[in-house]
């Protein structure tokens, strides 16, 4: 397999890891099977490996995990593919739709899921403004997602809806 992109992923990428967090990784490869995807989990790690073409398809669909890997400052790239990776520009409306649905799905969950919903809102806001985002949260952003994730379900849903609408102002 020919590696194209490798990055830490999940809580270690977002800056939300704690002492018991597993180590998530995301790797994009070239291999014979264009449908290839592998997801392996054990006690200490969670690794995703995906064919380059399938990865590009996920980027174009606005899949959060693919966009986070694409925009990760921690990523190691095969330099031959770096210009192409940097040229990828998913459709903002597609990204907005995917992030909206995903954030609302997370909204009904526990603290960790609500934190992910708020993180997606921050990423969506930056993406809609700049066409790119940094999945690595700053300390103030970590405090922001943690504060809102502590709200009860009803208050959280109201706040999330408001932040989503703000992120998409001028689009919806």
Across the structure, where does each feature detected by a protein language model lie?
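The feature captures the alpha-helical scaffold/lid subdomain characteristic of nucleotidyltransferase
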Residues: 1-19, 32-172
